[in-house]
Each structure stands twice: as C-alpha cells, then as structure tokens.
C-alpha cells in the first residue's frame, strides 16, 4: 500500500470516530503567516514534502493567490496527527486575512469548532485580528493562540529573552482582552488562553519550529537553545528539536473540542429549531444514525465536477444519491458525489458521517449558508457578514454574443461568494457588481476573464452611498392609486446602539419570529417597550414596526407592506441609494375589504410614497463608507504618508513607533481611496506595508452632499437636481 492509500485508509477509519475529530481553522491579520503555518502543518503530517512547505503554499492553490501572495478562498484539507499514542483526524480550513475577503472568514467559522489565532510577534494584535476573533466567538468557536515570526525578534530586533517574554505577555493579554469582550458569557473565563496549560504556542512558521510549555516540559528543549540555533542559522536542527506540527497539533488536540463536545453548546446557538425534537437531539449528540443535516459554507466551481459544495455535517450521514431539501431556497436536490479533501485534492467516499467536513456535488442551486437536510427543518440562522459591499463597478461584455455567458458567470460568482452583489441596471442594461473593496472586485473580475474567457469593459469603481435621516418626521399619509387604502407612517432615526446590535447579529435581520424577545432586547437598548412590541421586520439595518391597533384586513396586506418597505429601503428618495438606520412605524391604516382593491399595484406605491415623503420631512442626509487604513513604514516616510492621507479627506487616528518602524492608523472615505495602492507605493518607494478594513459609514459634509447627489442622479439617468419635499410628497 502506497503512502497516499495508507493516508486515505486512516482518514476513512477516523471519520467514523467523532471524538477523534477536530474541525479547526486558522485566522489572522493579513501577512501574519497563516498559510505558511497551514502548509508546514500539512508537511509535518506527511501531506506534502517538507522542503517545499512554507514556500509552496499548498492552500493557496488558486493562481491568483500565488501571484498576489495572499489567501483569497478558504481552502480545506484533512490530515492525521498522532497524540499520546492515538491518531486524530484534523480538518483544517485556511481563511483569508485580507479585509476585502471577510465573507470567506465568516463562512468558514460556521464549519469549525476551534480556531488557531495567529499573531505576528513583531506587529502584535492588529485590527483584523480583532475582527476574526470577534467572528469566531460569535459563532461559538473556541480559540488557541500561536505567536508567529519569533525568529524576527531574535534576529532583527535582537531582543533579550526577558524582552521577548514581555512582548509575548502583552500579546496574550491583548488576545484575552478580546476573548473577554466577545466570548459568550459562560466561556469568558474558560476560553482565555494561557502559556502554562499549553493553549499558547510560539515559534516561526517559516522556519518550521515551535515551542509550548507542555512540549518543553516533556522534551527538555529550552528556549535559550532555540535562540542559539536561530542566531547560528541552523534551521535543520531547529526543525528537528522543536517541530512546528507536533507542538501546534498537540495544542489543537488537547485544547480544541471534538464535534461531540462542541455541538452540545454550539447547536442551541446556531440553530433556532426545537432542541428536544428528534433532529435537535441528533445534532446535539452528533449522531451519525440520525436524519442528515449539513450546512454549506462554501461553493467552489470545479472545471471537471461543476459546483462542489463544502460544508459541515451536523447529524446523520451524507451519501451519494441521497434526496435532500435545500431549506432556505425551498427546493429539493439530489446529492451525486460525496468526498473529503486532502490538500486541494478531493477524494470520493461512499458516505461521510456527522462531525466531518464534506464536499458534495449535485446541489445545483445551493448557496453558501444553505441548510441541507433529509427532511424539512428550521434553517440554521443566517451567516453574519462583518462588512457590506461598498464599491460597485458596471461591466459590459465587449462582445454581444458573450452576454448569456456573462450572466451565467456572474450568477456563479455570486453563488461562490454571497458578499458579492450582482444587479442588472434595468435602465442602462449594465451589470452592476458590488463588493467589499477594490481588491475584492479586482480578483473577481480576473476570475471572470480567466475562468470564463469573457472579455469585459469595466467602469471606474463607484462608491455605494447610504441615505438616512436626522430627526423624527410628522405623521405622513400614503394613499393607494385607487384611493381605497391609506397608510399613516412616521420615520425616526435609529439609535446607534440598536444599529450596532443589528450589525453584530445580536438582533437578527429578517422577518421577526418572536416579537416579544426582540422587543425585550430593543427595550434594553433604550426603545419604548410598547412601541418595540410592534417590530415586524428588520432589513439592511432598518426596521419596520406595526404600531396600529385592531385595523381590519391589515394582516392580509402585511406581506405586501413589508415588500414595499424593502423597496423604499433599497432606493431612498434623494438619489435611489440604499437606506440605513431608519425606523419606519405604521401608526394607522385603512384597508379596503375587497381583495381586488388591495393588490400589489395599490399597496406598494402607497407605502413607498408614504415612507419616502416622511423621510423628506425628517432631515434627509447622505452617508458615505469609510475605510480604516493601517500602514507600516520606515520612519523617514512619515511626512509623505501623512500628506497622502490628508489629501484624501482622511484623518490620522493613531501613530506608534517600534524601532525604525512607524505604524499609522487612519480613516478615510472609500471614495477618496481609489488608486491609494499606487500612490502609497510611489510615496514610500514601495516600502509601505498596508491593509484596510471597513470602518462603517459617516455623514457626508453638507457642502459635498449636494454635489455627490447630483453626480449619482446623473449617473443613474435621473434629473440631476436634488429632489425637494414637493417632488417626493404627492399633493393630496
């Protein structure tokens, strides 16, 4: 039996023993060394050759990732590790650290139970570290810590062992502070990472060594010995004395939970169904004999197999030929092939039981986040994405005959990545592609041209603004065109605390299933409980409440009213941009008794006009997306970089100096950040390292707002003059 066959046989055997499985991820700030760590873990476990590991980046198997040197898609591999005489199956998902790809991180967190947080010993805890830790803890994923690039502290910064220990302590404190802040109440203490119990390891992924207290106690290897070997440059002995994969995977097996353990506390939080039902119990207990339930976390388009859906099996067993329900998209499907990953390679299996990460083909309409089950059940709660699309490009096929293929390609791209929004502009016939940032869109467009061979013309990037209001409106009446239905609404600005709670998933978006529970949360955040009890729907950071009493037939049109509310929120009155932070309260209504007189053609315009007119009376304003920029540069470029930022309406938030290196943290409007990469490279002769992340929305200064509204309206083929209250409010 060859090495590969042996490996597959071992994986097949361990798949059936969930207590021996660990589903883990690696998450970190960009360039802190995640992918190098993943590769060296694979090499140690015998999945790739050691010489190549760290240089070859197995998990970065997309050509673009190799070229850019960053991880774009969360890849998935399975490997075997022996700990205290027993074999364990470790399923590892590598996630991107670049902010534009935050969606991949969110999806990967759903599939795993534990995560290795990687922090660069030189840079310490960075903003993106905080984002990934928050995402992990929100999905009830337990963390351990690996402090990477320790070789740089020894070689470049020439720190003494004492100084290094101080630096480690600070990183551990910072990570524990994040765990304290974001972990679920009952795990704030339990999940803190500690050097003494081995839930912290430190080392160098690139040079393939690591240490932890349990390892040092067991083997007698001392830190001073490692320092000497590093200074001598004896990397071979380093690897042999303190092998990275042994230290890190021991930490994983010892401190991160098996599916059996994790599902007991994760399922009640991720799934809203009845825990005491048969299927609820099967998931709690990770029972391979129960009914099958899996959640898809990623769709990959494979040249040979078509769409491959990767996901986590919570209960039952996935088999080829199985008839299943796609719960969210309300349709049936049939699973064709079933397999698991070994590196980028997919290996077919007859069946994959609960507790494993599976790859299936045949589910043609599945999206990331879809719940797939053998019978109709409550879906898992929606995945929370940390930031929303803020940049749009318009694309057209250069060749008209490519149009049908372009539409199909865009559909596929949007399926692979739900944080990408695709829309056809009805008026201009252009396809609008919105993403998290410039890089996100660049990567997707490259994929479009390379994988599909479609030549496209791409517009300059356009920023997606938001419309909102500054004060409560008076009561506004909206009439249906036939005058038989009337709706009376009030709009109010949404308090920041409530908006944050929605964005962080504490108050879930969508139709409200349990108004009392949501009202209780809203009341805790300062809303009047009696008003909050009317909450019906939460949509893109806006809220619709029914505060009427005993209106006849209102229930019959409630679905239409909610659709109309969505339409009003998708395109605000100022420039048809999405609306944010608005509370719409229905306070009174008259609804015609006859079904015929209260269809969509009557209800939509009535509620839409009422909401837009109320917004015009509530001090309408424009918000623009901001980015946080973190730049590391040699001290002498300080002035050039500050100038570059202030020219872009940016402001400096913080500056730190460590040795020769300055870290600048600034915020600037996304609209001013296009072309920043090139500008900063030339300003610093290519010596700047920088990353960005979404920093929310801020109000556009008044003097700029009118000009921007004109530009947007002109681009959309509307009358460029900003509308007045008279234009929006009908004369009744």
UniProtKB/Swiss-Prot annotation:
It comes from the Archaea. Its main location: cytoplasm. Residues 19-260 form the tr-type G domain. SMART domains: EFG_C, EFG_IV. The keyword Protein biosynthesis applies. PROSITE patterns: G_TR_1 (PS00301), G_TR_2 (PS51722). GO terms for molecular function: GTP binding; GTPase activity; translation elongation factor activity. GTP binds at residues 28-35, 94-98, 148-151. One of its GO terms (cellular component) is ribonucleoprotein complex. The modification Diphthamide is found at residue 597. The keyword Endoplasmic reticulum does not apply. It holds the Pfam family EFG_III. InterPro entries: EFG_II (IPR041095), EFG_III/V (IPR035647), EFG_V-like (IPR000640), EFTu-like_2 (IPR004161), G_TR_CS (IPR031157), P-loop_NTPase (IPR027417), Ribosomal_Su5_D2-typ_SF (IPR020568), Ribsml_uS5_D2-typ_fold_subgr (IPR014721). It is found in: Cytoplasm. Keywords: Cytoplasm, Elongation factor, GTP-binding, Nucleotide-binding, Protein biosynthesis. NCBIfam families: aEF-2 (TIGR00490), small_GTP (TIGR00231). Belongs to the TRAFAC class translation factor GTPase superfamily. Classic translation factor GTPase family. EF-G/EF-2 subfamily. Catalyzes the GTP-dependent ribosomal translocation step during translation elongation. During this step, the ribosome changes from the pre-translocational (PRE) to the post-translocational (POST) state as the newly formed A-site-bound peptidyl-tRNA and P-site-bound deacylated tRNA move to the P and E sites, respectively. Catalyzes the coordinated movement of the two tRNA molecules, the mRNA and conformational changes in the ribosome. PANTHER family: ELONGATION FACTOR-LIKE GTPASE 1 (PTHR42908:SF3), TRANSLATION ELONGATION FACTOR-RELATED (PTHR42908). This is Elongation factor 2. It comes from Pyrococcus furiosus (strain ATCC 43587 / DSM 3638 / JCM 8422 / Vc1).
């Amino acid at each position: 039996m060859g090495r590969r066959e042996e490996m597959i046989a071992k994986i097949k055997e361990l798949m059936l023993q969930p207590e021996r499985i660990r589903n883990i991820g690696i998450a970190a700030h960009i360039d802190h060394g995640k992918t190098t760590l993943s590769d060296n873990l694979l090499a140690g476990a015998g999945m790739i050759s050691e010489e190549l590991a760290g240089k070859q980046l197995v998990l970065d198997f997309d050509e673009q990732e190799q070229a850019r040197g960053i991880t774009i898609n969360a890849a998935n591999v399975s490997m075997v590790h022996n700990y205290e005489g027993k074999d364990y199956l470790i399923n590892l998902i590598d996630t991107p650290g670049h902010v534009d790809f935050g969606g991949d991180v969110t999806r990967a967190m759903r599939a795993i139970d534990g995560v290795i947080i990687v922090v660069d010993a030189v840079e310490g805890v960075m903003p993106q570290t905080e984002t990934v830790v928050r995402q992990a803890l929100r999905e009830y994923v337990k963390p351990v810590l690996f402090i990477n690039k320790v070789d740089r502290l020894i070689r470049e910064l020439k720190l003494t062992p004492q100084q290094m220990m101080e630096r480690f302590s600070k990183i551990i404190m910072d990570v524990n502070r994040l765990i304290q802040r974001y972990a679920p109440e009952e795990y704030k203490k339990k999940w803190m990472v500690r050097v003494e119990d081995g839930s912290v390891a430190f080392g160098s992924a690139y040079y393939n060594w690591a240490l932890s207290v349990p390892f040092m106690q067991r083997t007698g290897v001392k830190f001073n010995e490692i320092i000497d070997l590093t200074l001598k440059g004896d990397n071979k002995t380093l690897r042999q004395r303190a092998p990275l994969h042994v230290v890190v995977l021991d930490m994983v097996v010892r401190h991160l939970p098996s599916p059996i353990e994790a599902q007991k506390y994760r399922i009640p939080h991720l799934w809203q169904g009845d825990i005491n039902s048969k299927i609820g119990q099967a998931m709690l207990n990770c029972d391979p004999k129960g009914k099958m339930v899996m959640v898809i976390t990623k769709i990959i388009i494979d040249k040979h197999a078509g769409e491959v859906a990767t996901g986590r099996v919570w209960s039952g067993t996935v088999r080829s030929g199985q008839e299943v329900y796609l719960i969210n998209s309300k349709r049936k499907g049939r699973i064709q092939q079933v397999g698991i990953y070994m590196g980028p390679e997919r290996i077919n299996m007859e069946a994959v039981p609960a507790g494993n990460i599976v790859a299936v083909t045949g589910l043609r309409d599945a999206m990331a986040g879809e719940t797939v089950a053998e019978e109709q059940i409550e879906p898992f709660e929606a995945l929370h994405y940390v930031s929303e699309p803020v940049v749009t490009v318009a694309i057209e096929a250069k060749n008209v005959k490519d149009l049908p293929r372009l539409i199909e390609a865009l559909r596929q791209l949007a399926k692979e990545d739900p944080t990408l929004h695709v829309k056809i502009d009805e008026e201009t016939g252009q396809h609008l592609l919105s993403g998290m940032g410039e890089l996100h869109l660049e990567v997707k467009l490259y994929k479009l041209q390379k994988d599909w061979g479609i030549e496209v013309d791409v517009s300059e990037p356009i920023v997606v603004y938001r419309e909102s209001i500054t004060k409560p409106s008076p009561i506004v009446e909206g009439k249906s065109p036939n005058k038989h239905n009337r709706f009376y609404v009030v709009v109010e600005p949404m308090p920041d605390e409530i908006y944050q709670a929605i964005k962080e998933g504490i108050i879930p978006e969508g139709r409200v299933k349990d108004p009392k529970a949501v009202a209780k949360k809203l009341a805790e955040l300062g809303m009047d409980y009696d008003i909050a009890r009317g909450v019906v729907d939460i949509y893109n950071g806006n809220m619709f409440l029914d505060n009427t009493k005993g209106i006849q037939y209102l229930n019959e049109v409630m679905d239409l009213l909610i659709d109309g509310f969505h339409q009003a929120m998708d395109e605000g009155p100022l420039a048809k941009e999405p609306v944010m932070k608005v509370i719409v309260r229905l306070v009174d209504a008259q609804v015609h008794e006859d079904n015929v007189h209260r269809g969509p053609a009557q209800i939509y315009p009535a509620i839409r006009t009422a909401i837009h007119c109320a917004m015009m009376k509530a001090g309408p304003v424009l918000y623009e997306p901001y980015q946080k920029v973190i730049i590391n540069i040699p001290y002498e470029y300080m002035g050039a970089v500050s100038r570059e930022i202030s020219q872009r309406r940016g402001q400096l938030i913080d500056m730190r100096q460590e040795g020769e290196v300055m870290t600048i943290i600034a915020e600037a409007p996304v609209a001013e950040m296009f072309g920043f990469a090139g500008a900063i490279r030339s300003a610093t002769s290519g010596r700047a390292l920088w990353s960005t992340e979404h920093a929310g929305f801020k109000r556009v200064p008044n003097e700029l707002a009118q000009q921007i509204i004109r530009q947007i309206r002109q681009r959309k083929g509307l009358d460029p003059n900003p509308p007045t209250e008279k234009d929006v409010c009908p004369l009744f």
